[in-house]
Design a protein with these regions (language model features):
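Membrane-embedded beta-strands that build the outer-membrane beta-barrel scaffold
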Residues: 1-9, 42-50, 57-65, 170-176, ...
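Surface-exposed loop/turn segments flanking beta-strands in extracellular/periplasmic regions
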Residues: 22-30, 81-91, 147-149, 204-217
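Outer membrane beta-barrel strand-and-loop segments of large Gram-negative receptors
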Residues: 4, 8-52, 141, 157-161
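Flexible, solvent-exposed coil segments and beta strand-coil junctions
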Residues: 19-29, 148-155, 234-239
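Conserved small-residue
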Residues: 32, 51-162, 226-227
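Extracytoplasmic gating/loop element in the C-terminal half of outer-membrane beta-barrel translocons
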Residues: 190-244
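Residues that define the transmembrane beta-barrel architecture of outer-membrane proteins
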Residues: 38-42, 55, 166-170, 244
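Outer-membrane beta-barrel translocator domains and adjoining extracellular loop/strand segments
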Residues: 16-20, 71-76, 196-202
Length: 244
């Protein structure tokens, strides 16, 4: 039987990044080398080989914990892929101190069950006047958290809502051999990451397939505090923690 443990720090520099440039150049962006990402963690590996009669058997397993962080971005925040099409713009970002490709959006704070909850969700401006935080909301829409407490809901209220990078990865392999015959099986697992479920942004087109989650959508007061009402207006239920 063998066992090993390793601590590692890997820094990746000068990654490719598409950066916006002035329009007078006739180009919208250019690819540059920018940014540094640090992967730090620990890895364990163990193996055991034995024999049963004429059959040789082996078990190998490994597990690793990794923390991924952007350490030298350059610009404060750069959008990466526009995942999900019309789900509120770019939701995969790169920023100093955050994991690479983190999901960026509004924090889900439940569902408006009735008009009174919408009317009670307010802020007071510098002149002492009260305003609705989500004036266009309807019962059944997502209530987004007003993080900065200023001027209602705006781009400054978006934050990191998920990490696509797994915290823990594991692998296990089993193998057996007898004379000229051998057999092996390998499994792999990743845990702790979030997945952006774009399919939850259900549109009104009849060509789309729906999952059983459609039956959990809000369809009246008290029916759901997680999934919003069905709506063809994607802006009313923009990307948020609900999509993770």
């Amino acid at each position: 039987m063998t066992f090993s443990a390793d601590y590692f720090v890997k820094k990746t520099k000068d990654m490719l990044l598409s950066m916006p440039i002035p329009l007078y150049t006739s180009y919208g962006s250019m690819t540059v080398n920018s940014g540094t990402v640090k992967n730090e963690g620990i890895e364990f590996e163990a193996s055991y080989r034995f024999k049963v009669g004429e059959v040789n058997l082996g078990i190998n397993g490994n597990a690793s914990y990794v923390k991924n962080t952007v350490t030298d971005q350059g610009p404060d925040r750069v959008g990466l892929n526009n995942i999900g099409g019309g789900m509120g713009g770019q939701v995969s970002w790169r920023e100093n101190g955050r994991p690479y490709g983190f999901f960026y959006g509004y924090l889900h704070d439940g569902i408006f069950q009735n008009q009174q909850e919408i009317d009670n969700y307010t802020y007071v401006d510098s002149n002492g006047k009260t305003h609705l935080i989500q004036p266009n909301a309807k019962p059944g829409d997502i209530r987004f958290k007003d993080l900065d407490g200023k001027n209602g809901l705006n781009g400054d209220d978006r934050t990191m809502i998920g990490n696509p990078n797994p915290d823990l990865t594991m692998g296990l392999s089993l193998n057996a051999s007898w004379k000229a015959i051998d057999f092996s099986i390998t499994t792999y697992g990743a845990f702790g990451q979030q997945i952006l479920k774009c399919y939850r942004d259900i549109s009104s087109t009849p060509l789309n397939n729906y999952t059983a989650e459609i039956f959990q959508r809000w369809h009246g007061e008290g029916t759901s505090d997680k999934f919003p009402r069905l709506s063809s207006a994607s802006s009313s239920n923009s990307v948020s923690y609900t999509h993770l």
